[in-house]
């Protein structure tokens, strides 16, 4: 065995081919099975996707209240604390009571369009809660290190949503300037504010809209999608479930409309 291969074996353990051969032997197979065919490139044109988008919009316009009620049910099933309000005033009053009940002293929020509708900054100021907007990191306001520490030290992270999926009860957040995943992951409590127009039925709806963005924006669809389906959960080999290890242990969803 060449020296380089010996060193890699020592560092990484059993070589891949030997490991797979051992697995095949345990399964009673003498030769490798045929590999799965490669995934084909998505072939839909922009015109095709725009037609699908129009069909999606027409579907989402129907049964509006029923869809929101279904979202409330599915989100609660994944341990979201969900509340729906007919107007901004009632939503703001609820958020004020929530922040007071939680004893929040430090908050961080993202910079998303929803905060042009709901006066979160004014509310935080009225409650004497220290707050930071995680925006323009490294552009003269907050360095990456400062922003990260503020998000870790905060009692609550407040975000909007880009999509909210009825099928899974998930809030979906896209990467963008002015928004860090740590706003929803770092603090022990996450509050997501959802507008009705962000609610879709299925994950397929999300991926359709993402493919459209990909074609419309010159092939840039961002580096990740952040799906938030209730509080952080993890379990060990004995299936002991622990909440809040790798993210917030408490999540709240406020639906406007």
Briefly describe each language-model feature range.
Residues 1-257:
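The feature marks the mature, well-folded catalytic cores of soluble enzymes
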């Amino acid at each position: 065995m060449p020296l380089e291969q010996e060193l890699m074996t020592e560092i990484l353990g059993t070589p891949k081919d030997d490991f797979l051969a051992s697995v095949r032997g345990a399964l009673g197979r003498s030769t490798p099975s045929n590999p799965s065919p490669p995934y084909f490139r998505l072939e839909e044109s922009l015109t095709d996707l725009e037609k699908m988008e129009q069909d999606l919009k027409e579907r989402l316009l129907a049964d509006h209240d029923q869809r929101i009620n279904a979202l409330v049910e599915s989100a609660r099933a994944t341990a979201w604390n969900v509340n729906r309000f007919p107007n901004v005033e009632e939503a703001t009053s609820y958020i004020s009571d929530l922040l007071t009940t939680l004893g929040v002293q430090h908050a961080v929020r993202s910079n998303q369009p929803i905060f042009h509708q709901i006066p979160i900054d004014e509310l935080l100021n009225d409650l004497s809660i220290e707050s930071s907007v995680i925006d323009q990191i490294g552009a003269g306001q907050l360095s990456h290190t400062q922003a990260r520490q503020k998000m870790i030290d905060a009692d609550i992270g407040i975000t909007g949503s880009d999509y909210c999926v009825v099928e899974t009860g998930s809030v979906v957040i896209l990467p963008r300037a002015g928004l860090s995943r740590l706003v929803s992951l770092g603090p022990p409590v996450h509050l997501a504010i959802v507008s009705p127009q962000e609610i879709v039925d299925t994950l397929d709806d999300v991926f359709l809209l993402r493919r459209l963005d990909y074609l419309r924006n010159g092939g840039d669809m961002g580096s990740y999608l952040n799906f938030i389906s209730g509080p952080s959960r993890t379990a060990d080999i004995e299936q002991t479930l622990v909440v809040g290890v790798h993210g917030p242990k408490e999540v709240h969803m406020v639906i406007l409309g």
